[in-house]
Amino acid sequence: MSAVNSKTKFDEGRLMQVLVAPIVSEKATMIADKTNAVTFKVLQDATKFEIKAAVQLMFKVDVQSVAVLNIKGKTKRFGKSVGRRDNIRKAYVTLKPGQELNLGGESA
């Protein structure tokens, strides 16, 4: 199944929009150190195949796997008014051994 999907062509404009932002937190840094995985905030309707293709296109690295999860937005109050934060879709992109992706901007 993956061999068929890896040959599928994606729209390059769409791939440039799939990755919204990298997530830099304590947990994301710990996961990056242990498992060579990078965490991204992605579009709600992005698929694993699109995320993999977008990372390979933008950063020129080989991707081993992609794990995706949806985070429900929290309900928040400000005085009497009740609001809700947006839902977030998060992707953990595991790179193949020997590959490195530096999002910090500092050169090694």
Curated annotation (Swiss-Prot):
Q: Which GO terms describe its biological process?
A: translation
Keyword vocabulary terms for this entry: Ribonucleoprotein, Ribosomal protein, RNA-binding, rRNA-binding
Q: Name one GO cellular component term.
A: ribosome
Among InterPro entries, the record links this protein to:
Nucleotide-bd_a/b_plait_sf, Ribosomal_uL23-like, Ribosomal_uL23/eL15/eS24_sf
| Domain of life of the source | Bacteria
- What PANTHER family does the record point to? 60S RIBOSOMAL PROTEIN L23A (PTHR11620)
User: What protein family does this chain belong to?
Assistant: Belongs to the universal ribosomal protein uL23 family.
Family matches, as NCBIfam families: PRK05738.1-3, PRK05738.2-4
- Describe its partners and assembly state: Part of the 50S ribosomal subunit. Contacts protein L29, and trigger factor when it is bound to the ribosome.
Task: State the name under which the record lists this protein.
Answer: Large ribosomal subunit protein uL23
Give the species this sequence originates from: Polaromonas sp. (strain JS666 / ATCC BAA-500)
Name the gene behind this protein. Answer: rplW
